[in-house]
């Protein structure tokens, strides 16, 4: 994906330690927000986002429709942010359960991508292949509808990286003739 060049737009203005003013200062390799009072450096790192790719028996992909916010009415592969103290696999299962009412088993990482579409919040997204082990789809949390879609009939998506990921899924599926993405045919790694 495209690298976002510096300088970054300043998002934080006060030191979290002492309340002093934060300003960008040049260090060896880049600008960093530095407290003018105590010298604290506020490192700006991407947040980890997690998403789970789930297909039904017909090989259709589960998507959720977002409610509220700037992506209202647009669809996405069910996703969320990892909590600071949360294991990445557990966090993925939790987010998926909150948004779709489905309990999943993680099979493997499908892809990892940088998300730069929101300048206020860069993330690293991890898309897992997963399969449903319990529950019926019901929208919750940030979603108001969940539905399965064939890969060639995907509705309007909220996030550019979901486009990339779905294109990868299409390629993988067509390369493997039938479907190696079907839950029963995904090799489980331990
Ligand atoms: Zn400070």
Predicted regions and their residues:
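Conserved N-terminal beta-strand and adjoining loop/helix that marks the start
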Residues: 37-61, 81, 112
